[in-house]
Amino acid sequence: MSDHYDNNNWFSGSGLSCDFSLLFSSVLLCSRKEEEEEEQLRQFRRKMVTRTTVDLRSDTVTKPTESMRAAMANAEVDDDVLTYDPTAFRLEAEMAKITGKEAALFVPSGTMGNLISVLVHCDVRGSEIILGDNSHIHIYENGGISTIGGVHPRTVKNNPDGTMDIDLIEAAIRDPRGELVYPTTRLICLENSQANCGGRCLSVEYTDRVGEIAKKHGLKLHIDGARIFNASVALGVPVHRLVEAADSVSVCLSKGLGAPVGSVIVGSKSFINKARRLRKTLGGGMRQVGILCAAALVALQENVAKLEADHKKAKMFAEGLNQIKGLKVDVNTVETNIVYFDIVEGSKIKAETLRKNLEEHGVLLMPESSSRIRIVLHHQISTSDVQYTLSCIQQALTGVQVENGI
């Protein structure tokens, strides 16, 4: 063993040599570096905890209010699978009333709500639905209608205002009595407000017209109303009137309304009976769900009235962005709480760089591409938060322009 090891050389007998002191120094250096990095991370975390974060990534980031937490703590509950949870029952009855539908069902998420709705209407595998090419169901719901339901999506181009041309919708309908090679159209889906188009609102007249087309061809109409309350406030039209033409609607409770979890789907009693069974199939049947529904009831009571202020702050934000050199936003398209803004061509900053810069100042937002960013207002963003964010963006853009001599 002594031939192979000494104080300074390992494996010397095998022709491999390593200076022990050098190795030990390297280990110490790596250890110190790791400690420094960990300390930097701890300092960053302390900053993020002590600093008030302005989170503009989505309206899904809101925290439960004190009144929500109190309602959750005191919620009357029961097993919602074995029988009915009384608080869930209250929420479902309230949502049915607000939307003018016969019945309602609480589900864990908007994605599940849309999936259940599509599957109820398209109960034959190989059915086809018509929906916007920029719709949430088509882009952001993991292709569930196809992978789980065997439903084929046929997209129609979304216009910038969130609509699809009526003529194109009707032309996309495929009659089962026609060509044998085509799937059978059974459903049309709309989204109101239309998130990817900047929170644009579909008018009553437009929705009614699509409803007429659906009835004419024996189809059903589903509305993804994740932000239907935002559309209602922006248009000055009651929710029940906005969705009158629809056979089913999904309404998100955790977006603009600010509840922590859940969505509600509404429709006829027979629709909801089928939806309840599908909810169980998909793993969405929960037990003492009233704890969550209690917060949603508070959201309906307290936060609907705050949506108009969210829309005003979004407009203020858009107008402020337009005053910053290097940015562009069409203020006239800002109808609800969503704002998309573009970094103009030729600017020396990318969206991801701007995101990182703002994060260092406690502002969180979501790039959509290398030159486009989305921000979403909600009731936990104040006017001063908007002004602070605009100031941070101005400083970031000014710094880049100075560095590049612009």
Go through each PLM region and give its residues.
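Conserved PLP-enzyme active-site core in the AAT-like
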Residues: 2-6, 10-32, 41-361, 366-381, ...
